[in-house]
Regions:
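Symmetry-related core transmembrane helices of the 12-TM Major Facilitator Superfamily/SLC fold
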Residues: 1-13
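Juxtamembrane intracellular "pre-TM" segments in multi-pass secondary transporters
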Residues: 18-49
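Extracytoplasmic gate region of multi-pass secondary transporters
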Residues: 43-97, 190
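Interfacial helix-cap and linker-helix signal at transmembrane-aqueous boundaries
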Residues: 69-70, 106-107, 193-202
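Cytoplasmic membrane-interface "Motif A"-like loop-to-helix N-cap segments
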Residues: 108-121
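C-terminal ends and interior cores of transmembrane alpha-helices
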Residues: 121-135
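Intracellular juxtamembrane helix-capping segments at the cytosolic ends
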Residues: 154-167
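A late C-terminal transmembrane helix in Major Facilitator Superfamily
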Residues: 164-200
Length: 203
């Protein structure tokens, strides 16, 4: 719970102040709540839609990690876990935090499009593997989930940075509003669709 407070203090005292060139600053050509320039910007919307898919996958995984690990553990006769499944699920999700930060650093070195494509393809392969991994050792399943947690989030910062970079001049705030509003619809739909698929295919 102290995270936001620490972030505010870090921003105030640690982030250097930047002097903006008023002459170079862009002002919107329409009113502040006009999102049409953003919606017409194909480059920015590509990142927005990519982030939507990212959130769909991320929140589906987070919402169902505990249930999945409980099911996988129930199939392992030799299971001897030192901590609870809930704690394991929390640890699995924590692997994604540094992956998001480091992912953008790799994107800067390798190229943003190349990095995002590589991570999304890798994440898709891991998702398919994990879906069929429940009969394996629970420790192997947990290891795959940790790796999957990292690949899910490794493109997060790169997608947001890409949207910022591609924002139409004067519409950075509007671009971020569209970015968040549309993308977090995917956050709502991911767990919902996952649950529906379980119900549809349950025996």
């Amino acid at each position: 719970a102290l995270g936001p407070l620490l972030a505010i203090l870090a921003t105030i005292f640690l982030v250097p102040r930047i002097k903006h060139d008023k002459e170079a600053a862009h002002t919107p050509t329409t009113h502040v709540l006009d999102f049409r320039p953003v919606l017409r910007c194909r480059a920015a919307m590509a990142y927005v839609l990519g982030y939507t898919v990212h959130n769909f996958e991320l929140f589906a995984f987070r919402a169902w990690t505990v249930a999945f690990l409980v099911y996988a553990a129930s199939l392992d006769d030799d299971i001897n876990l030192p901590i609870s499944i809930i704690m394991l699920a929390a640890i699995v999700n924590l692997f994604g935090v540094p992956a998001s930060i480091l992912g953008n650093e790799f994107a800067l070195k390798l190229g943003r499009h190349r990095w995002i494509t590589l991570i999304m393809l890798t994440s898709s392969v891991l998702a398919c593997m994990i879906g069929f991994s429940t009969a394996w050792s629970i420790w192997l399943v947990i290891g795959l989930c940790c790796l999957y947690s990292m690949t899910i989030t490794a493109d997060s910062a790169a997608l947001t940075a890409g949207a910022v970079e591609a924002a139409p001049p004067g519409y950075l705030g509007a671009t971020m509003a569209v970015h968040s509003s549309i993308a977090f619809t995917g956050s709502f739909l991911g767990p919902l669709v996952f649950g529906i698929m379980l119900d549809v295919n349950s025996s």
